[in-house]
A protein has these predicted regions:
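Extended, low-polarity transmembrane helix blocks
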Residues: 1-63, 76-99, 103-166
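Transmembrane alpha-helices and adjacent helix-loop boundaries
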Residues: 69-74
Length: 166
């Protein structure tokens, strides 16, 4: 009986053996690959949104102008407020949603880019409060992980020596 218990505890058989094997396989995934995938996963929704805000080089789309002027409201303490300077906010959001994700994918200034996208996520949360569980919470978690861990070895930060904490 002692041998069967010992085999289960060391991953020798059954479900615990399968779990032990799976853990070993997952441990082979390099941290740098995980951080690269995390950077891409956070960048994609912002980049897609940013592309929709432009009609040409530094020319906001009619849709972006409309939603920032007419539809988007900040929900703060139970009240709704119009965006201050809506066209400026649309322009800055559009720039941020293009520049920051590109930096993130390249791994250039990863912590800065992730912090910027975290700030944008907070503003988006105030604008679309019902999106917190499906979108904003995962975005915030990914951004915080990248702020803490940086871009990893597969990043421009690593090449130029900005990954001091890695």
């Amino acid at each position: 009986m002692a041998n069967a218990t010992q085999a289960d505890l060391t991953g020798g058989g059954g479900l615990s053996g399968l779990v032990h094997w799976a853990n070993g396989m997952l441990a082979c995934v390099p941290r740098s690959l995980s951080l690269l995938l995390l950077r891409i996963a956070l960048a994609v929704p912002f980049l897609k949104s940013g592309w929709l805000k432009w009609d040409g080089f530094l020319t906001l789309s009619a849709g972006a102008k409309y939603v920032f002027q007419e539809e988007f409201k900040l929900h703060i303490l139970g009240a709704e407020y119009s965006y201050p300077f809506p066209l400026t906010m649309a322009f800055l959001a559009g720039l941020g949603e293009i520049i920051l994700p590109i930096l993130l994918i390249l791994g250039l200034g990863t912590r800065f880019a992730a912090f910027g996208l975290l700030g944008m996520t907070v503003v988006i949360q105030l604008t679309v409060p019902e999106g917190w569980a499906n979108f904003h919470l995962p975005w915030a978690a990914m951004a915080i992980a990248l702020i803490v861990f940086g871009g990893g070895r597969l990043s421009a930060d690593q090449v130029i020596g900005l990954n001091r904490m890695d």
